[in-house]
Amino acid sequence: GVQRWLYFSKFLKNLGWEPIVITVKKSKASYPVFDNSLESYINNLIVHKTDTLEPLKLYSKIFYGNSKEGIQKGEVLKKNFFHHFAAFIRGNFFVPDARIGWVSYALNKGREIIKKEGIKYIVTTGPPHSSHLIGLKLKKEFSLKWIADFRDPWTSMFYLKEMYRTRFAQKRDENFEKNVLRKADKIITTIGELFHDELIQKANIS
């Protein structure tokens, strides 16, 4: 996912656009994966890095022994009561995902850039699907054109079934997803035709 939009940013620049990227500071990322071979793609890009708040770093520290290990997106450990409890916390208190703590920081930086640069178009990509909530808010505040990129399913992702979600949490997440699908000007997905049809049905669009 990172590589795809990194490449897009490079080609957009070649076409006369000036992409501006908002991301998390390297020192703040709880699940940092670095590929130094991609550095050449960002030499001429404008990148703004923000803080983030991720209380689930404590989860990583307790169960993985390392706060930088991060939250295993597709794996729920079920060794004992504490792992069951941790899965419940992840699934019900961090909706739509464990990166929800970044939203306010990204929103503040986005507002600052939009006002300063006169931005008219924005793109959000997920997962983490909480990034789409940033686009949803910025579009409402500034009447921007917004593209939402779905690299993976949202509320139908297989591992959510292992997080003991309550009906309330699931419904809240589905409402987030539906609002994004209905309010975004364009939706992009490369997952496949079945998921494409699923998104259309959820959004009640054609």
What are these regions (language model features)?
Residues 8, 130-133, 137-141, 154-155, ...:
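Membrane-proximal helix-turn-helix segments that form the acceptor-binding/catalytic region
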Residues 1-56, 186, 192, 196:
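N-terminal subdomain of nucleotide-sugar transferases
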Residues 91-107, 122-142, 148-156:
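An aromatic- and histidine-rich active-site surface loop
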Residues 65-121, 166-174:
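Conserved nucleotide-sugar donor-binding subdomain of glycosyltransferases
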Residues 179-206:
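A short, active-site helix/loop in glycosyltransferases that binds the activated sugar's phosphate group
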Residues 117, 158-163:
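Short acidic, glycine/proline-rich loop/turn micro-motifs
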Residues 15, 117, 138-142:
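Helix C-cap/helix->beta junction micro-motif
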